[in-house]
């Protein structure tokens, strides 16, 4: 079972504003962009409401994340890899009694604000600016990160 929770703002204005300026060189009518962490939790079974609340509290997460919109792009660790953050966070959850969690991973969702809906070409154009291609990959399907886990 996969749960996806919203997190806090991922980039401070110090990091976000220069990124916005670089994106605007490729996408001139881009007005703004926002960033938000999200947490993907792969659990062995469904979690009840109390377990979900406790899990959100440990992660510092908000409510379940809505499905990805057409003006958003998520950046996650590359498929088939486990980030150092994931290893440590999963260990912490297990030490807190959450043995039901197989793995937890963190990503960033970038939301692009523009008068017009972004095209696939625009999203593909700015994607290389958003991630380190050695360890991360942009995705429109966060569920694919856990496809190889049984």
Question: What is the predicted role of each segment?
Answer:
Residues 1-150:
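Core nucleic-acid recognition elements
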């Amino acid at each position: 079972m996969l749960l996806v929770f919203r997190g806090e703002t991922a980039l401070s204005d110090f990091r976000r504003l220069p990124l916005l300026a670089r994106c605007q060189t490729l996408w001139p009518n881009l007005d703004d962009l926002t960033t938000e962490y999200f947490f993907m939790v792969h659990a062995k079974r469904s979690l009840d409401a109390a377990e979900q609340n406790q899990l959100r509290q440990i992660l510092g997460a908000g409510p379940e994340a809505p499905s990805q919109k057409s003006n958003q792009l998520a950046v996650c660790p590359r498929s088939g890899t486990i980030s150092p953050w994931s290893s440590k966070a999963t260990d912490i959850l297990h030490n807190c009694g959450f043995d039901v969690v197989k793995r937890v991973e963190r990503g960033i969702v970038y939301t692009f604000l523009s008068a017009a809906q972004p095209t696939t070409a625009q999203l593909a154009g700015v994607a290389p600016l958003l991630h380190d291609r050695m360890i991360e990959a942009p995705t429109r399907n966060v569920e694919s990160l856990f496809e190889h886990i049984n």
